[in-house]
Curated annotation (Swiss-Prot):
Domain Sigma-54 factor interaction: 141-370
Modification 4-aspartylphosphate occurs at: 56
NCBIfam families xrefs: PRK10365.1
Protein encoded by which gene: zraR
Residues bound to ATP: 172-173, 329, 359
Residues in Response regulatory domain copies: 7-121
Protein name per its UniProtKB record: Transcriptional regulatory protein ZraR
GO cellular component: cytoplasm; protein-DNA complex
Protein source organism: Escherichia coli (strain K12)
PANTHER family: PTS-DEPENDENT DIHYDROXYACETONE KINASE OPERON REGULATORY PROTEIN-RELATED (PTHR32071:SF117), TRANSCRIPTIONAL REGULATORY PROTEIN (PTHR32071)
Record PTM text: Phosphorylated by ZraS.
């Protein structure tokens, strides 16, 4: 199995041991975060979704068993491997009863560590394949980050109600997908979802689109047209870029919301409508109200329930999932056998700033698939702005040769032991002769 995008948290109050493990695991291609106490580990688990936790049993303040219990309370699905000394195997048995997936005896045998990690991750992935992922893929939303999980929980809470929803987020973050998810999860899901981008139309056209018009109401009105409010009757009306509408349209929209009735352009007939309204904007409407550009009463009518859609910068851990999702789509569409991204290309995607958010990522992946002549997308197929993104030192996903990794780990152990080769070999679980042989390569 590949190790790209697998996040491991190492928990140990021995900083030197943490550093050695980090170098080793990164050399095997894993993403590694460190925690030097149980408290730090819990903070990180709250902030990030990890694929696996590697936790020492003997720690000051909060031991490994207590840390394990708290981690399982926060996320029961996360696999935890416990590290223990020979003298505390009974503690390892207790850890297994508490929910640990397996345990490792210290000093660690690197081959056994690698095999145990592979086994634990394979076990987790087989469970994931049998249970629905927290991606809301039925709504076209992909992600496992805490920010995405929070968004999905908000959607689940808001959807069953009849409350008006105001969705705020930068352009390209997927505000319409959120609106569609709310509608699809609501009691109105069998009725129409009607959408309209308010920024795409001038005032007169927007009025006609929203409320409809009679035949002959204006030049070109050769037949009567029902507006979007009437089309959405019984269902949901989604108005995108609501912050761009004119003062006159704000007045008309406010009346429609308050009275639950509309009037076609050129008609005196009042039409009652039963519509749930969802609006979206990239603007700060509270600031627009303070500046006098948006009506305060309309703002309060719209902002009954507010949902903030995170930018792609706020959910970077979802970028590999999103990139893979788009890659599969465009590879099928272009009938290309694309296997994936090179580690360098994925590094660039993860560290790029994404001012255009998900829409920009989608376009970048489509472009790369179209230009690709090989099997893996590299930096050559990415737009220049992305390909020139600086990668912070030590955060590359490139996999180092095993010989280099072993040498780094041995040097770290020697530094920890003050250059004592015998002690370094003992802590690494190898003979002094083996240590010297590996150093000389």
């Amino acid at each position: 199995m590949t190790h790209d995008n697998i996040d491991i948290l190492v928990v140990d109050d021995d900083i030197s041991h943490c550093t050695i493990l980090q170098a080793l695991l990164r050399g095997w291609g894993y993403n590694v975060a460190l925690a030097n106490s149980g408290r730090q580990a819990l903070e990180q688990v709250r902030e990030q979704v990890f694929d696996l936790v590697l936790c020492d049993v003997r720690m000051a303040e909060m031991d490994g068993i207590a840390t394990l219990k708290e981690i399982k309370a926060l996320n029961p699905a996360i696999p935890v491997l416990i590290m223990t000394a020979y003298s505390s195997v009974e503690t390892a048995v207790e850890a297994l009863k508490t929910g640990a997936l397996d345990y490792l005896i210290k000093p660690l045998d690197f081959d056994n560590l690698q095999a145990t990690l592979e086994k634990a991750l394979a076990h987790t992935h087989s469970i994931d394949a049998e249970t629905p992922a927290v991606t809301a893929s039925q709504f076209g939303m992909v992600g496992k980050s805490p920010a995405m999980q929070h968004l999905l929980s908000e959607i689940a809470l808001v959807a069953p109600s009849e409350a008006t929803v105001l969705i705020h987020g930068d352009s390209g973050t997927g505000k319409e997908l959120v609106a569609r998810a709310i509608h699809a999860s609501s009691a109105r899901s069998e009725k129409p979802l009607v959408t309209l981008n308010c920024a795409a139309l001038n005032e007169s056209l927007l009025e006609s689109e929203l409320f409809g018009h009679e035949k002959g109401a204006f030049t070109g009105a050769d037949k009567r047209r029902e507006g979007r409010f009437v089309e959405a009757d019984g269902g949901t009306l989604f108005l995108d870029e609501i912050g761009d509408i004119s003062p006159m349209m704000q007045v008309r929209l406010l009346r429609a919301i308050q009275e639950r009735e509309v009037q076609r352009v050129g008609s005196n007939q009042i039409i009652s409508v039963d519509v749930r309204l969802i609006a979206a904007t990239h603007r700060d409407l509270a600031a627009e109200v303070n500046a006098g550009r948006f009506r305060q009463d309309l703002y309060y009518r719209l902002n009954v329930v507010a949902i903030e859609v995170p930018s792609l910068r706020q959910r970077r851990e979802d970028i590999p999932l999103l990139a893979g999702h788009f890659l599969q789509r465009f590879a099928e569409r272009n009938r290309k056998a694309v296997k994936g991204f090179t580690p360098q290309a994925m590094d660039l995607l993860i560290h790029y700033d994404w001012p255009g958010n998900i829409r920009e990522l989608e376009n970048a992946v489509e472009r790369a698939v179209v230009l690709l002549t090989g099997e893996y997308i590299s930096e050559r197929e990415l737009p220049l702005a992305i390909a020139s993104t600086p990668i912070p030192l030590g955060q590359s996903q490139d996999i180092q040769p095993l010989v280099e990794v072993e040498k780094e780990v041995i040097l770290a152990a020697l530094e920890k032991t003050g250059g004592n080769k015998t002690e370094a070999a003992r802590q690494l679980g190898i003979t002094r002769k083996t240590l010297l042989a590996k150093l000389s390569r």
